[in-house]
């Protein structure tokens, strides 16, 4: 890569976001963002910030520390919040909470507020918000218990308690939105942003 092309850093511990960038051929280095995500979310909720704005703020905060530590780098931050009505659904953290979330979402449509933000030298250069609409089918209690048993602890770190690229697909009757955004990264708009910076060929 030319010395004139800025390095790309992904401020995320998410395997899904890293996998999407790798599969798209984006040269990048991943690093943990080093922020207290739950404390930031609690503060934003207390301030009455909407889920869509919170996703953008969280993506930016995740990228900021790395951006200040790596001058000239393009630092990508992202966040995803499942929202239904005015309620945010945080990552469940346990299978018991995952069950509660899925019972709430069953037979209803929720939105995945999915933000990606790019910073350089601590300043936001660009952001994009995707809002996939996810309609869960009215699955049976037996299906729910089988799903929780088979999906296991991995879903406790996922917004909405599912991974669409796996068993979670069986939860849904309909989706509106691209699969990249549903998996946590609005990839096509991000690639469009990176091209003029020389990271990818136009």
Curated annotation (Swiss-Prot):
Organism encoding this protein: Rhodospirillum rubrum (strain ATCC 11170 / ATH 1.1.1 / DSM 467 / LMG 4362 / NCIMB 8255 / S1)
Main EC class the enzyme belongs to: hydrolase
Enzyme active site: 79
Keyword Hydrolase: yes
Function in brief: Nucleoside triphosphate pyrophosphatase. May have a dual role in cell division arrest and in preventing the incorporation of modified nucleotides into cellular nucleic acids.
One MF annotation (Gene Ontology) recorded for this entry: nucleoside triphosphate diphosphatase activity
Main location: cytoplasm
Keywords noted in UniProt: Cytoplasm, Hydrolase, Nucleotide metabolism
Annotated family: Belongs to the Maf family.
Catalytic activity: a ribonucleoside 5'-triphosphate + H2O = a ribonucleoside 5'-phosphate + diphosphate + H(+); a 2'-deoxyribonucleoside 5'-triphosphate + H2O = a 2'-deoxyribonucleoside 5'-phosphate + diphosphate + H(+)
EC number from the UniProt entry: 3.6.1.9
GO cellular component, as recorded: cytoplasm
GO terms for biological process, alphabetical: nucleotide metabolic process
Protein location: Cytoplasm
Cofactor(s) listed in the protein's UniProt record: a divalent metal cation
Highest taxon, organism lineage: Bacteria
The protein's name: Nucleoside triphosphate pyrophosphatase
InterPro entries reported in the protein's UniProt record: ITPase-like_fam, Maf-like
Coiled-coil segments: none
